[in-house]
A protein has these predicted regions:
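"…centered on the first transmembrane helix and the immediately adjacent amphipathic helix/loop
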Residues: 1-60, 64
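Interfacial helix-loop-helix junctions of multi-pass membrane proteins
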Residues: 42-51, 95-126
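Short, conserved structural micro-motifs that define repeat-unit consensus positions
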Residues: 51-68, 91-102
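Internal alpha-helical transmembrane segments of multi-pass membrane proteins
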Residues: 71-91, 143
């Protein structure tokens, strides 16, 4: 499922290829690779921080994808709060829906695991919102 989500986001991302820096492509590919490797080799269960790091990094990349797809530098100076809030909210929402999907279709993890995943998803979304604000201020360069 995670691969399908990244394929869909990648396709949408390619349609707007003029709206994102090349360095972001590497981050996006690393997030997809981290998720795929985690599922293929059982790294989520084997390595203790792998699940948390992957959740935070993936949410960070997905949230930045929203920024590049929907805003792409078209945000006026006085709309910084709206930009940061929407990038954070979209990323956090994706994390919450992922946890719902995981609960119903993958496995019934403990409540502690679900809560910790939601917290690190929020951290990744917050980091993406801060990066989006910095990119808007600097002119969308991520090099």
């Amino acid at each position: 499922m995670i691969v399908a989500v990244f394929v869909g986001l990648s396709f949408a991302h390619l349609l707007r290829s003029d709206r994102r820096p090349a360095f972001f492509d590497v981050l996006f590919a690393l997030a997809a690779l981290a998720g795929a490797l985690g599922f293929a080799f059982g790294l989520f269960e084997e390595l203790v921080p792998y699940d948390e790091l992957t959740h935070a990094f993936t949410t960070f990349c997905v949230s930045l994808t929203f920024y590049f797809l929907f805003y792409g530098g078209a945000v006026p100076e006085r709309r910084a709060v709206a930009l940061g809030t929407s990038v954070f909210t979209l990323g956090d929402t994706v994390g919450a829906y992922w946890e719902i999907f995981e609960w119903f279709f993958v496995a019934h993890y403990t409540m502690a695991d679900t809560i910790s995943d939601l917290l690190v998803d929020s951290g990744g979304a917050l980091a993406a919102a801060l990066v989006a604000l910095a990119l808007r201020r600097s002119g969308d360069r991520l090099t």
